[in-house]
Each structure stands twice: as C-alpha cells, then as structure tokens.
Amino acid sequence: MKRTNIVWTALFIAIFVGTGPLPAKDSAPKDLWDRVEHHNADSSGVKIHYVALGKGPLIVMIHGFPDFWYTWRKQMDALSAHYRVVAVDQRGYDLSDRPAGIEQYAMPLLVDDIGAVIKAEGRSSAVIVGHDWGGAVAWTLAMTHPEWTQALIILNLPHPSGIQREIKNNPQQRMNSEYAFNFQKPGAEKNLTAEKLAGWVKDDAARVHYIEAFKRSDFEAMLNYYRANYPRPDQDSAALAPAPLPKVTVAVLEFHGLGDQALLPGALNGTWDLVEKDFTLVTIPGAGHFVQQDASDLVTATMTDWLARRIH
C-alpha cells in the first residue's frame, strides 16, 4: 500500500470557526442547475432525492453539513464527460424526506440511503465520494458494504477511528469539538436560520440556491446527525475508545484543506494502516473546510486523473 505520510487538519465548519479559505472562482457552467436530471430513490419508505449527469461508471457524491447536492457543482460537469455522476440530498435536506426522530439519522440508515440510490440507478456498486458527514457515510459504507464500493474519495473528514482517538486523548481536540457538542443539546436548532447556514457560501448566485434549499430542509434533522453519531462530551474515556473497524479494501483518495481547524492534525495519523490498497492524501494550504469549492480546479483535476487510472 502506498503511504502518503502527511498530516492534515480536519472537519467541517468554516462558518463557525472562521477559517478564511481561498477565494473561490465559480467555474461551473451557469446552466448546470438546469441541466441535471432529478430522481428519487426509495430507502425503506424514505424518499432520497438526487440529481444526475452524464453516462458511464457510476459516481455517487454525498454532501455534509450544512450543504446539499449543489456543493458538487464544480466537479459534476468535468466528471460527467466520462461518468454517470450522481449527487445526493441526504435525508433531512432539501428535496429528500425529513423523518422525525434522532434514531432516523443513525449511521446504518444513512448508509442504506446510498445503497438505495445505487440500486435506483440500476447498478450494484459505485465510486463513493463524501465530504464532512457525507465523508463519514462514505467511510462507513466502504467498511460495511465493500460490495457497493468501487473506490473511495473523502474530503475533509478523518477516518472515524482517528476522530474518536483524538477526542479521547487530546484535550485541545475536545475543545475544538465544542461546536458539535453544542449541536447535540436539545433545541440547538432554534439558533439556526437558512441565511445563517448559507453564510459560508461565497458566490452570490449560489447562495440564493442554498438559502432556498435550507428553507426546504429540517434544522432539527441536520443536528440529529450529531446526536445520533458523534461522540458525546459526557462519555467516559472507555466509551470514547475507538471500536475495531474493518479495513477499507478499495483504493482511497483523501483531500484536506489545511485552513479547516475544527479537527486537529493528529486525527489523520495512522489512516494508512486502515486501508488495504493504495491511499493517496492531498493537503491543500489556504483552502478551508469546503475544499471542493475553495480549491475546485485542483480537486476536480486530481479526482479526474486518479479515477482515470482506476475506473474504466
């Protein structure tokens, strides 16, 4: 297995930690919004909305918080020249269903949603791409359903065992995770608005779409991802110990914008020991949490080249 022994900073939230990423040039076609196909998948009675573009091997792209399918606008056009590119609205967001209850956002259900999308496309497997919470879903899917996974691309989300290890052992990391612990508190969603959640979006035209999508979304559902899946501050150290997880058996490409400070670099250590095939890590100085937008040209070109060598 190839090792790229570079440590990067992690997780999500430029809007709450003020990372100041690179100015983003919106190079996506202006009509991409109108050119995508809209579809729905049935995940055990929960409607999962997704958009699609292109023909060829299937790529499924999964957004994080606070986001929706449009986060991938700068990758979809280039990749769709050779692939069938699907971008999902996760449950709780935009045009997907918003089931009530914390238990409805447990990781196994989020993984099953992606399986339903793959099935709706008439395929048995796909390249899985995930950012932030979408990255957590992507890691978990690759570990628990390798038969669905042709290759894995992760953006700004460390391997789950690395996150748990750092929260357990690193006091600074626990401090940097306060935003997530606050999201777990009852009623935290009352402090959110569509406009506030879209505040990180730099492109004015794109921000309009984001505000509209967030007004269709459920803020409580968004925070239920944290309540159902993120380590809790009141857990003892034994409960925070990383559980043994299966190794990832496909090739992995991982990006990280080094301007993202919500997770410290130690969370990346040892990731190469958890992947059986080649593991490529790309760190991008000056880019923040939303690296797919902050460094869109580099991310897209790297994805295109990496996939061309592996997926035909």
Protein language model regions, located:
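Sec/Tat signal peptide C-region and signal peptidase I cleavage site
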Residues: 21-23
